[in-house]
């Protein structure tokens, strides 16, 4: 199958997921946010959305240490998103903005969202959600409609993401800190790579 090189990967999302999001939002979507891994999902959906409305902002959420948000690959803890190479299935022209997300922000956002919404999500979901929250902070349009793709379950991360002891051992949670103490608004927006589509 080779999802990193198979053109059917983005094509499937351009043919199905993109049209579904457009229909479900009645064409009112203004921002689409997703993690970048193979790049197939964000490429396919982003292409479709830009074909419908070039003003839709496609935001790629990328772990700090991955190559998509710039720089060379470095180790990071977030699983299921980011890469240390450029997949053939990722169209670098699709994302209008790429937000770099730290492991701490990804993990703790996922934990807090799970507690608040009852959705057992993995850390790649936390990556996308944190990026969406940060971009939403900079948007003054009251009619803005964000769609955030949350692709993984936290079921496989119970001993890691959902373990305070593990988070502390990884340096993501201070000794005397609780997950509930984390405030995503207190974190400054990480490096953002923006594309000027007016040129």
Language model regions located:
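Active-site/ligand-binding loops adjacent to catalytic centers
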Residues: 50-123, 161-199
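ATP/nucleoside-binding phosphotransfer catalytic cores, i.e., glycine-rich phosphate-binding loops
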Residues: 115, 143-162
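A short, acidic, amphipathic alpha-helical segment used as a generic capping/interface helix at domain edges
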Residues: 106, 113, 129-138
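Glycine-rich beta-alpha junction loops
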Residues: 5-8, 37-40, 62-67, 73, ...
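Phosphate-handling active-site elements
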Residues: 51-60, 135-145
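Active-site/ligand-binding-proximal alpha/beta "capping" segment
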Residues: 2-37, 92, 103-119
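Short glycine/serine/threonine-rich phosphate/pyrophosphate-binding segments
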Residues: 35-46, 124-132, 157
